[in-house]
Amino acid sequence: MIKLTARQEQILNLIRDAIENTGFPPTRAEIATELGFRSANAAEEHLQALARKGAIEISPGTSRGIRLRDMGNGDERFPGRQMALPHPALMQLSLPLVGRVAAGSPILAQEHIEATYDVDRSLFSAKPDFLLKVRGMSMRDAGILDGDLLAVKKIDTAKNGQIVVARLGEEVTVKRYKKSGSLIELLPENPDFEPIRVDLAHDEFALEGLAVGLMRTWN
């Protein structure tokens, strides 16, 4: 059992709550704002202390690159933890892995499925329906990297701020969702990319799913 200070416990709980509510960890700036720190640097110092104690892992260069680790207390939550595929003894779900998606066909069409993974249900904030192979770095600062496997639950509607898989005409993309009236913005988590704006009155758009977890295979 790792011994944490009261402040470290507070930050760890904040990370867990953010992961549970939104599917992803908070940024340093969000931690600082929530806990009344003067700067994101103060949050970074506490995160580094948590990492040294083995409570979290930090991915350098990403604002949301925080992963929860097993602290030996049975409270190991996901998403936010990126990990290797689990031991066969823990496998409970069989999830299709979707690769490239052809225009005009359902995302779970047989020709899109590259493989099937058996994974532990407890790894996800909600039961996923499929895994999507991430392509590109537009969601880098949310800790979602090229080649990662995004666990996705099929949905018809989403809340502002959630990370979704959306279909825009012939393209499928992973972005943060924001809707106002008939206008939708699909927001990247990388300043090198521009938001995608959708007018439901004119543009072809569909929600394919909600991100509920993230897996990374280690070689």
Swiss-Prot record:
DNA-binding region in chain numbering: 28-48
Q: Which gene encodes it?
A: lexA
> What is the species of this protein?
Janthinobacterium sp. (strain Marseille) (Minibacterium massiliensis)
Q: Which Pfam families match?
A: LexA_DNA_bind, Peptidase_S24
A Gene Ontology BP annotation from the UniProt entry: DNA repair
Q: Which domain of life is it from?
A: Bacteria
Function comment: Represses a number of genes involved in the response to DNA damage (SOS response), including recA and lexA. In the presence of single-stranded DNA, RecA interacts with LexA causing an autocatalytic cleavage which disrupts the DNA-binding part of LexA, leading to derepression of the SOS regulon and eventually DNA repair.
Q: What is the protein name for this chain?
A: LexA repressor
Entry's Gene Ontology molecular function annotations: DNA binding; serine-type endopeptidase activity
The record, for InterPro entries, names: LexA (IPR006200), LexA-like (IPR039418), LexA/Signal_pep-like_sf (IPR036286), LexA_DNA-bd_dom (IPR006199), LexA_repressor (IPR050077), Peptidase_S24_LexA (IPR006197), Peptidase_S24_S26A/B/C (IPR015927), WH-like_DNA-bd_sf (IPR036388)
The record's CDD domains line, in alphabetical order, gives: S24_LexA-like
Keywords, sorted A to Z: Autocatalytic cleavage, DNA damage, DNA repair, DNA replication, DNA-binding, Hydrolase, Repressor, SOS response, Transcription, Transcription regulation
Q: Which SUPFAM superfamilies match?
A: LexA/Signal peptidase (SSF51306), Winged helix' DNA-binding domain (SSF46785)
